[in-house]
Amino acid sequence: MDEIINFFKSHDIKSIGLGCFGPIDLNTNSPTYGHITNTPKQAWKNYNILGTLKGHFNIPIGFDTDVNAAALGEATFGSAKGIKNVLYITVGTGIGAGALVNGELVHGLLHPEMGHIFIRKHPDDLFPGICPYHHDCLEGLASGKA
């Protein structure tokens, strides 16, 4: 975070758009709004990433999931420009998806954790999966780490 803060302080920026891996708390009424919550990435668990940035910058800071930020970027500047309904899926250390429906980012009680959808394994597949929460969800079976 120190390197990120120093980088942005060395530039004349007017706002920041923070697309963050999760799970994150997007509920503006929650006491942990802006936190990375119960992530398997132990060094980031319960980290107030938005509050840390706000403590260093007195500018507008947008906050959403990394995949929603990517979906919005594609709909604004990229291959989905001008399209109102967009689904952006990424496969890496996890599996994530961001979505726009009628031009609006999808949110709910939490953000959609599409990588944690349960899928049926082949009966002969004995791999237990790597997701620390569900083991054999989509992310646990098909992410880069799996």
Residue ranges and their predicted role:
Residues 15-16, 22-85, 124:
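Glycine-rich phosphate-binding loop and adjoining helix at the ATP-binding site
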